[in-house]
A protein has these predicted regions:
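Glycine-rich beta-alpha loop elements in corrinoid/cobalamin-binding modules
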Residues: 60, 79-213
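Flexible glycine/acidic-rich beta-alpha junction loops that bind and position SAM and/or redox cofactors
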Residues: 106-111, 233, 272-286, 350-365, ...
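Catalytic cores of alpha/beta
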Residues: 164-172, 329-333, 401-417
Length: 527
């Protein structure tokens, strides 16, 4: 490989890393780069590799590699590289550098939350998010610059909109931005580049056919195995909406193969059955098909247990509606995923406690229930999941199009209803995506300065961090090194305590401002 493979695939340094074995802890990459020294970067965001070739990769990047090889490109011509060791891989024969991005400019939800976390705690925010810095570091890597004359840079992944919507793809000299599912048009694009043909600056790939999606060759970070693609609930702001109705992969010949790759080659002991909505595996429409979900769970459980009793399965996403629609299914699945006294995390896009917002922007999220029932559904679903040993990681979005103060009050009311449940409530700033992607970017400071929105953000973060503290042991559980696990646990515990205390002080200030405003309004009405 002295002259380099024709295609080198990589990702932002923060995205490429397994973060010491705990992908849940990867949120640290959203911190400003001035908080992360080169020593911390190498320690926390290192990528296990052999002569620059990554041992594991982000799932999406593993899929890109598999698609290229499946399309007929030679295995020797495609390599997934550690972004910190590109000099060992890129050579004179390299013609394409493909970069997978999750947050190339630091405009994602995670970066927005981190900004609020630091700002409300009175901590300085300088520079750009580390994850964005790790992307820019690839572009200025000496080996990339050395071979730039003959090298086309292609950027893809779920956050490419950040580049195209801001025009930074041109400013940064990126040759091609690929948007959409890679399997649909990606292999043809790469072949055109290798054959010296002219290609567009932006390529829009549609939803791929299920039969055109191959199984991964390189193991995935976090033991991720995709069991479905798409969602079909039709939320206006959501990228999975662009993939259309939910499509389920067969267990035999697809899911089982990826489980084996992750266990046998990746040495992974926990398999994450990834889906935008796990409990709708096998569904043809909105309603779940419980027998198919239970059958999948049993098969996956049986397969991983064939490698040893300490091998486990987990999943990552659900909606509130499907849990309430079929609670018996949830209980049966939990017997396998959360066997014994095991607890795991599961994510839920709550998004809003306002039936008006739900009806206007994401009516499908409540189906088969009505938007008016949605707050009740959220509360009930989290209770069911807690009863089955899931800690829910819930998101609630601010600054959605058409949002009013009444909608924020509904959010606060829902937050109050959730205070005794195990749910980590992250407040998210609206970021343009999907059908709404061309709206202006969220102004984070403006939301903090608004007393009502500032109060909601602060209350949501207090709840989120309090639950995170209680679940900190679970968050670091998959870290490989017990000493590292102990260090991260204790540092995290200290930081969370400090930040929560600062937030309570801030909340008192918001309450003072709100009370003063109410008194002024009463006085005005009296006069």
């Amino acid at each position: 490989m002295s002259d380099g493979p024709k295609i080198v695939l990589t990702a932002e340094g923060a995205t490429a890393s397994e973060t010491l074995g705990s992908t849940v802890a990867g949120f640290i990459s959203a911190l400003p780069d001035n908080y992360i020294s080169s020593i911390i970067s190498k320690f926390y965001f290192g990528v296990k590799n052999k002569k620059g070739i990554a041992f594991k990769a982000p799932y999406g990047l593993s899929k890109v590699e598999a698609s290229l090889i499946y399309s007929g490109i030679s295995r020797e011509d495609v390599v997934i590289a550690d972004p910190n060791n590109l000099d060992k891989i890129i050579g004179n024969d390299t013609r394409i550098l493909g970069i997978y991005v999750m947050d190339p400019l630091g405009l994602s939800f995670g970066s927005g939350i981190t900004y609020w976390i630091l700002k409300l705690a009175g901590l300085p925010y300088q520079g750009i998010p580390y994850i964005a810095r790790s992307f820019l570091n690839i572009l200025i890597n000496p080996s990339v610059l050395k071979h730039r004359k003959y090298l086309k840079i292609v950027v893809g992944g779920p956050a490419t909109w950040q580049l195209t919507d801001t025009g930074f793809n041109k400013k940064l000299g990126i040759d091609v931005v690929y948007e959409g599912e890679f399997e649909s048009k990606g292999p043809a694009l790469f072949k055109d580049i290798l054959n010296g043909r002219d290609v567009p600056k932006i390529v829009l790939g549609g939803a791929a056919n299920l039969n055109d999606i191959p199984t991964i060759i390189t193991p995935s970070n976090g033991g991720l195995v995709e069991i479905t693609r798409g969602c079909g609930r039709g939320c206006s702001f959501c990228t999975p909406t662009l993939s259309g109705m939910i499509k389920s992969f067969p267990f035999e010949g697809h899911i089982d193969k990826e489980i084996k790759v992750n266990i046998e080659k990746g040495k992974t002991k926990d398999i994450n059955l990834h889906s935008e909505e796990f409990f709708r595996y096998g569904a043809k429409g909105i309603d779940p098909e419980p027998e198919k979900v239970i059958e999948l769970t049993k098969k996956a459980y049986k397969l991983v247990k064939s490698y040893g009793d300490d091998y486990t399965i987990s999943t990552d996403f659900t909606t509130a509606a499907v849990v309430v629609e079929s609670p018996k299914m949830v209980y049966e699945v939990a017997d396998y995923i959360n066997e014994g006294n095991r607890w795991t995390f599961i994510e839920m896009g709550i998004e809003s406690g306002s039936p008006r917002i739900i009806k206007r922007l994401m009516a499908g999220k409540a189906k088969p229930f009505t938007p008016e029932q949605y707050p009740d559904i959220v509360e009930e679903s989290i209770g069911i999941l807690n009863d089955n040993r899931w800690v829910v990681v819930g998101t609630m979005i601010l600054n959605l199009p058409g949002e009013t103060d009444d909608d924020i009050i509904k959010n606060l009311e829902l937050l109050d209803r959730l205070k005794k449940l195990k749910v980590i409530t992250w407040p998210l700033p609206f970021i343009p995506m999907g059908a709404l992607r061309h709206r202006d970017f969220t102004i984070l400071d403006k939301m903090l300065l608004d007393p009502l929105r500032g109060e909601f953000i602060t209350r949501a973060l207090i709840k989120a961090l309090s639950e995170s503290k209680d679940s900190l042991e679970l968050a670091v559980d998959k870290m490989y090194n017990p000493i590292t696990k102990s260090i991260i646990f204790n540092i995290g515990n200290y930081i969370i305590n400090y930040v929560i205390n600062r937030y309570r002080e801030t909340l008192n200030e918001y309450n003072y401002i709100k009370t003063r405003k109410q008194k002024r309004e009463i006085l005005r009405e009296t006069l």
